[in-house]
Amino acid sequence: TGAGDSPAGYEIDGTALTITDSGTYTVSDSCADGSIKVKKGTTGVTLVLDGLTLTSENTAAITCGKSSEVTILVSNGTENSLSDTEQNNDDNYPENENAENAVIKCKDGSLVTLCGDGELTITANGKNGIKSGATTDEDGEASLTIRDLTLNIDAPVNDAINAEQLLNVESGTLTIDAADDAIHCDLVLNIGADGTDGPTIDITNCCEGLEGAELNVCSGDITINASDDCLNAANSDLTDYDFTMTISGGTIDAYTSGGDGFDSNGELAITGGTVVVWTANTADNEPLDADGTITTATTPVADLTAITVSGGTVLAAGGSSGMGMNLEAAQPCVIYGSTGFGGMPGSTQSSLIAADENFTIEDADGNAVYSGTARCGANFILFSSADVVADSAYTLKAGDSSTEGTAQSGTVSTGMGMGGGFPGGRQKPDGELPEGFDGQMPNGEKSELPDGEVPEMPSGERPTPPSGQGSPTDGNAPAGDSTSDTTPTA
């Protein structure tokens, strides 16, 4: 109920409901083609979904107008479903003036909270599952907050959740299947909060998992299965921005079949939590990749591509693009393999461990400090935890093979070794060289080019390794916001 210009605080035109004043409004039952809209500038609205099944053919199922303040509450113990059709996409249907490109559309300057103890399933046949707008001088601050509820999103066209300004995923249980990004924010994306359990997020399929110009994971239990970057701090529309990725808590179990694990176009900081990230064992994938500083300490190292470990547990494994990395290891770490040139982009590299192989990392006394099962073959493994002691030996055991490594602290360089040879290479169990190989060229001769000369690149230049840049966020440019607040016609 509500009060205002309309006696009940709302208007109904066919199957289109428009909320015009503050109040609590409960919607239930089912509708094959209808819509709910909170009028521009309307604040203090609580929209209760109480067993609602709603499909909208040519616009958003729920629209929160510009400068509105709305709480969408999913009622305890209820199952609710929102969906649209392919017509709710003005890229493919430019003649559709009512298209909002999302099942739930939150316009510029809107403050929207999606919460409750019930379950909501969103099927985005048009474009995005949820789209949140930007902060503007005219419309005010914008944000989207998700907490408590069980939220399932199927987005076979584009993003499951796409925000332009501020996106807080505080708690709840999210299951996402997306054609492009699972959870994307043009600016600030916060997952969980310090001192909380945070959300449970299961991203079963996506191109990129979590993406924001400033990406913070503070708590939660996150599983990601991606075809590109699992986590990405980037925005191709921002040319001068201090991109940051900070992992301070929670648990992340991430795998990508064709991109980087964690990819930051600026700084990458892992200061706590448990991180397990696997990348496909090809020459153009990095478990950890950053253009600025990679760090797990509170103070980044300026102008240095580095990983600094100060807390938490980190297992980063997979392939590499051939770029050497420096590490600031405040908490000691042990590295097996190398990020040195291991092959042409896309080529498969020799593995320290094979896909689905059980492995352990043991200290000098044979105590396991880590054990797991490989998601894929890996020629590079970085491990750090509070149990790792600097200058101590640790052995990676997988099947009948073992690889030795020494934990290091301070500034550590992986060097430019050859695809898995440094700092540790996979050996026969007895540490001997393969049979028939004594480490020398045949006949004891050295390999030389004709006349003993080294070829020069054109103009005397040496080849340049891949840049390590994060993947551009194609398709994630802010979508144009509809300026019309006319009630959609069903």
What residues fall within each predicted segment?
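A composition-driven surface/loop motif
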Residues: 1-458, 462-490
